């Protein structure tokens, strides 16, 4: 499993080792299983080597106060004190008083107290969590326990059991009240994020997009599901939150699935569409940012972030190339030597990450992984994966720092080429083949992209995308796109010209999403297209056959994107006419000897549930 990977066994002669039994998530029991199983493997990481964000805080003392944002995992909202003796609320970093959102933590006899930088003490008042300048000590003591929710993190409570854990009351959202609910609820789970990891921004006042059909925003995203910006080449893609301090390039490949091969099974066993990984690009030396804008240009299929800091204009550009099969990230600045970043690549499925710097002042980050799968007879055949990221700069230096990760110093510009792929093979009996070739394929892809160069890569991407996107045009009015997209949505009922443009923009966004999620491998876009930020997504982010997968393709024929139907149609033909499982479903479910059928919930391996 690589250098630095271990298994813990009762003794050296025992054939079993410590294992994550059943599902891989917080709160699962730890048991024993055969040595060599991927779910045994662990590494030892010191607290000082942990990357942002931390889950547990450093305890403050009078001489050394350490402040954190307390961030809810659902929605990424921050715990904020409001007025004196008022109920606390979830808040956005970019709305409100930062001193009300920063907290230091003290501990005594296993109980914890929280004081904001503005001097307000967290306390319990009836069924709510309040903050005030002064309170009776007995009301200010809380517990902290590790959550058993799949999100992973900490829950703050007034005891260690029962309906006593701080919760975003009536759902996640800015301005909600903080109350209490059962341990394990997704609205409870928090992490402690160091103050320097989040940077406040002020948005740009005027912005004229290069192209009319552009989604644009004046603050970073705080909620992945509702606010991230997706890019994709039809099979491999990424989502972008636009944070200036830690740029999270979360990426997916349509073929990375856990679960069962063929046959009907329970909802728990047919698997999940998985998060492939996260490339964290941390910009060092950050201070307050102005003129911030993030955007998704759907005319050219390119996303970006622009901002100003200390008089320097910074720009970040992102696109997913179909011709060159990779995601590309580029950083530039208006002054030379201003790009200073640290890279951390997170493998979300269990293998070590390798960081190397070559003699040409260029860096490569790689990892390999395996995902557990099981057939009807209980035999396990893993799906393998591999990822490579190539980092090149104009000027500056690239080194491995003391923590062993990649650091860029004093660059004029920086470009990253990223690819993750699996050994999924829809024509193979076990749906996989060629695992031993994956690392070489990933490396060849990013090296080929680097050799081609950024300008040629972007030109090829743009030509390829526009050959599809430009086939259809809908014009409902002559309106300039000079209003941020959230404001365009909120004013939809009030301005006829703007609401016509929103409909025009929405129409084209649907076509963009289909182009970005239905090319390459013969699999349809799933419930979330190709985008997914966790390993236990809603409805497994599956191929939902009652109506959802059909809806993905409603724009295909009417808007002249007919060939984007091919991955879906090829998937149906393969599973219905070539593979045996869907014909067996007709016998087992419909008690007929001819024809085929499929269940509502389906994975990519021909399996589905009895739901």
Task: Show which residues each predicted segment covers.
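Lectin-like carbohydrate-binding module/patch detector with strong preference for beta-trefoil
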Residues: 1-200
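Aromatic-residue-lined binding/catalytic grooves and analogous aromatic/hydrophobic interfacial grooves
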Residues: 200-611
């Amino acid at each position: 499993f690589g250098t630095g990977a271990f298994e813990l066994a009762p003794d050296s002669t025992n054939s079993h080792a410590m294992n994550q039994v059943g599902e891989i998530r917080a709160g699962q029991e730890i048991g024993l299983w055969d040595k060599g199983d991927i779910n045994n493997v662990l590494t030892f990481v010191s607290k000082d080597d942990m990357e942002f964000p931390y889950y547990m805080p450093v305890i403050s003392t009078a001489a050394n106060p350490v402040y954190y944002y307390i961030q809810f995992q659902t929605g990424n909202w921050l715990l904020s004190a409001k007025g004196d003796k008022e109920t606390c609320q979830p808040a956005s970093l970019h709305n409100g008083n930062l001193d009300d959102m920063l907290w230091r933590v003290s501990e005594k006899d296993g109980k914890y107290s929280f004081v904001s930088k503005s001097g307000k003490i967290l306390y319990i008042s009836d069924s709510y969590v309040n903050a005030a300048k002064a309170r009776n000590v007995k009301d200010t003591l809380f517990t902290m326990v590790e959550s058993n929710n799949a999100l992973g993190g900490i829950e703050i409570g007034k005891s260690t059991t029962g309906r006593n854990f701080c919760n975003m009351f009536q759902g996640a959202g800015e301005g909600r009240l903080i109350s209490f609910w059962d341990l394990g609820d997704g609205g409870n789970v928090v992490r402690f994020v160091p103050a320097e990891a989040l940077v406040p921004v002020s948005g740009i006042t005027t912005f004229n997009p290069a192209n009319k059909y552009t989604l644009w925003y004046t603050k970073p995203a705080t909620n992945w599901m509702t606010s991230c910006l997706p890019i994709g080449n039809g099979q491999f893609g990424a989502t972008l939150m636009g944070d200036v301090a830690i740029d999270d390039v979360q990426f997916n490949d349509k073929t990375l699935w856990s679960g069962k091969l063929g046959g009907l099974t329970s909802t728990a066993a047919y698997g999940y569409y998985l998060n492939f990984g996260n490339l964290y690009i941390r910009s060092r030396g950050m201070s307050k940012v102005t003129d911030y804008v993030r955007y998704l240009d759907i005319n050219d299929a390119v996303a970006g972030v622009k901002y100003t800091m200390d008089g320097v204009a910074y720009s970040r550009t992102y696109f997913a190339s179909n011709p060159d099969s990779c995601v590309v990230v580029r950083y530039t600045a208006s002054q030379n030597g201003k790009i200073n970043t640290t890279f951390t690549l997170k493998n979300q499925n269990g293998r070590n990450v390798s960081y190397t710097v070559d003699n040409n002042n260029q860096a490569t980050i790689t990892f390999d992984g395996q995902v557990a799968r099981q057939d009807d007879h209980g035999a396990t055949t893993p799906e393998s994966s591999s990822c490579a990221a190539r980092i090149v700069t104009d000027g500056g230096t690239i080194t491995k720092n003391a923590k062993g990760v990649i650091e860029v110093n004093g660059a004029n510009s920086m470009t990253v080429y990223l690819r993750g792929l699996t050994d999924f093979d829809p024509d193979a009996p076990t749906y996989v083949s060629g695992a031993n070739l994956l690392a070489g394929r990933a490396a060849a892809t990013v090296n080929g992209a680097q050799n081609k160069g950024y300008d040629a890569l972007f030109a090829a991407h743009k030509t390829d995308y526009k050959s599809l996107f430009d086939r259809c045009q809908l014009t409902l009015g002559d309106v300039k796109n000079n209003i941020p997209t959230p404001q365009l949505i909120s004013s939809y009922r009030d301005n006829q010209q703007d609401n016509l443009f929103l409909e025009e923009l929405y129409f084209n966004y649907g076509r963009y999403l289909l182009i970005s999620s239905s090319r390459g491998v013969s699999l349809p876009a799933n419930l979330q297209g190709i985008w997914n930020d966790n390993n236990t997504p809603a409805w497994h982010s599956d191929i939902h056959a009652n109506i959802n997968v059909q809806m993905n393709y409603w724009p295909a024929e009417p808007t002249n994107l007919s060939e984007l139907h091919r991955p879906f149609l090829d998937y149906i033909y393969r599973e219905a006419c070539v593979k045996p499982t869907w014909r067996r479903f007709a016998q087992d479910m419909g008690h007929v000897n001819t024809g085929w059928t499929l269940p509502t919930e389906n994975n990519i391996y021909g399996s589905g549930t009895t739901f």
